[in-house]
Amino acid sequence: MSEIEPSLLLSHARTIARDNDISCWALPTGELLVPHAAGGSTFIFVDQLEEPVLHLHTSPRGGVDLSEISELAYLANEWNHDCISPVVVVDYDQPDCVSVSGHSYLPADTSPSREQLAAFLLPALRNAEVLMDLLAQSHPGLVREASPELAPLADAPLEPFTLDSLAGLLPLIGIQ
């Protein structure tokens, strides 16, 4: 890739995911969403505030009680693999207020080649899947079943896309 274009970078990321049998959805805003079998999802986007950076943000669907924070902190500190850094997240406004999210990023100011992008993306997505599996085993409340409200959405006619509609859909797929 010679020039940095977020849409091109994300298009290559989506192609790499699909070529490796990883389910990857393009959102109307251009970002990508990778669902995980154990629950949760990885949101892929390009941040261009300063230098362009490809971000992967992985989060489970649910949360657990504050009493489990020390176990989750231990898990996040012990399980810190290549390409993903889990952190404990506390949202005091929610009844199940403790969750874990994972972050991976690739500085893209040097226009990574497809091979470099694949070398970053594939391990990051594999580790995100492993993290979701681990959370499902150790803290099942973090990876709840998808909301039953998603089923009618699958067959619903497409409505005009707005930021408000995206904000309403993201919690249904596990992004807080």
Where are these regions (language model features)?
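Short, highly charged C-terminal tails/helix-capping segments
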Residues: 136-176
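Helix-rich interaction surfaces within compact, conserved domain-sized segments
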Residues: 125-129
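Short, ordered beta-strand-loop transition motifs
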Residues: 25-29, 48-50, 90-98
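Ordered, soluble secondary-structure elements with a strong preference for glycine-centered loop motifs
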Residues: 3, 7, 66, 111-118
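Well-ordered alpha/beta subsegment
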Residues: 94-122, 133-143
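Charge-rich, low-complexity N-terminal segments
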Residues: 1-47
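Short, internal acidic amphipathic alpha-helical interface segments
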Residues: 58-99, 103
